[in-house]
Amino acid sequence: MNWQIGGNNMKFLVVGCNGMAGHIISIYLKENGNCVEGYARSSSPYIDTVIGDVNNVELLKKTVVNGNYDSVINCVGLLNQFAEKNKSQAVFVNSYIPHFLADITRDMNTQIIHLSTDCVFSGKKGKYTEDDIPDGLTFYDRTKALGEIVDDKNITLRNSIVGPDIKKSGIGLLNWFLQQDDEVNGYVNSIWTGQTTLQLAKTIEYAAKYKISGLYNCLLYTSDAADEL
């Protein structure tokens, strides 16, 4: 893969660098001329990786504080049915860790780029804006809403994404679709306003380069995420 369009020479830490979003973000930022390191439970095939779990907050803190990063990208999350079955862990990963990262970098130049989800909204109202109060109903929805960082230094990006998994056994939509042998059912009168993981990586680099802060619904009707910021 070669997505390079001119480097920015920034230094990133991707927490959760082996996930569906994290590995594409890592590849894109590295190929675009940036210094990219990862934090995950296993080594990334693409970038240097600190082997650790987010439950090990001392190691995570040491990595972030000593790394002199321009931006730390938080890609970790406990999803849907896993959050429902492991509620205390879901609160820790989805709600606590983002604010922990913001707290330990408060007096540093490091920006936290936190990935949230459009699932903080139930979908009942439609046409949600950043000013709407999250009304998601599931435990996952609510823990992700609690984890959102809203301040004038860091940025939270609410996303709905699709992209390749790092493993063939991945459970993402694209992997599932590519494994089907027959026709698959679709939807009518529905609009999906999300983005690919590659487009998300471009959005993240733009936000990091210009130190954009706050809360953004990255639910796009165009392919240019930068215009939305």
Label each region the model flagged.
Residues 15, 39, 75-76, 112-118, ...:
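SDR active-site strand-loop-helix element
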Residues 43-56:
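Rossmann-fold cofactor-recognition segment
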Residues 137, 149-206:
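NAD(P)-dependent short-chain dehydrogenase/reductase
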Residues 221-229:
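Single conserved hydrophobic/aromatic residue that forms the stacking wall/gate
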Residues 85-113:
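NAD(P)-cofactor binding segment of oxidoreductase domains
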Residues 14-28:
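N-terminal Rossmann NAD(P)H-binding glycine-rich loop of SDR-like oxidoreductase domains
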Residues 54-93:
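NAD(P)H-binding glycine-rich loop region in Rossmannoid oxidoreductase-like domains
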Residues 92, 96-100, 119-157, 161-166:
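Catalytic helix-loop patch of NAD(P)-dependent Rossmann-fold dehydrogenases
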